[in-house]
Amino acid sequence: MPSFDVVCEANMVEVKNAVEQANKEISTRFDFKGSDARVEHKENELTAFADDDFKLDQVKDVLISKMAKRNVDVRFLDYGKTEKISGDKVKQVITIKKGVTGDLSKKIVRMIKDSKIKVQASIQGDTVRVSGTKRDDLQNVIAMLRKDVSEAPLDFNNFRD
């Protein structure tokens, strides 16, 4: 019975490359001369540092542009609160979303059931497994989800026959 998984996870290699490119651009830009602006990457978390709120926004813009060039969807990023650290400097923690959330997975299962396509959808942790008897039905489900789900970047993997 053919099946596939609906997941929501960023390519961490591309995220790392985008952070390195952003840091390289920040270190060479004239408007960041003499400032301690940078982006740090630790597992599923990015931390943006800058001298003030304006420069922090500039750092985030550089990061977003580099991620877009590396084909990393910016909907993976979840921005935390801006915190003041020593003196006037500020930092912001940006978490990288991983996995399909509970509400989104329920919405996906409901959409699949309401579509009347002859497939079964089940929630398995942070993924949604879709299985059916025909490969064409599964491809129709993928097309429907790509069209209708816009709040999260979905990937489809583990396609089995």
Swiss-Prot record:
Alphabetically ordered keywords of this record: Nucleotide-binding
**Gene3D superfamilies per record:** 3.30.70.860, YajQ-like, domain 2 (3.30.70.990)
What GO CC terms are in its UniProt record? cytosol
MF (Gene Ontology): nucleotide binding
What SUPFAM superfamilies does the record point to? YajQ-like
> Is the keyword Nucleotide-binding assigned to this protein?
yes
Pfam families registered for this protein in UniProt: DUF520
* Primary role: Nucleotide-binding protein.
Known NCBIfam families for this protein? PRK05412.1
Q: Which PANTHER family match?
A: UPF0234 PROTEIN YAJQ
Stated name of the protein: Nucleotide-binding protein RALTA_A2535
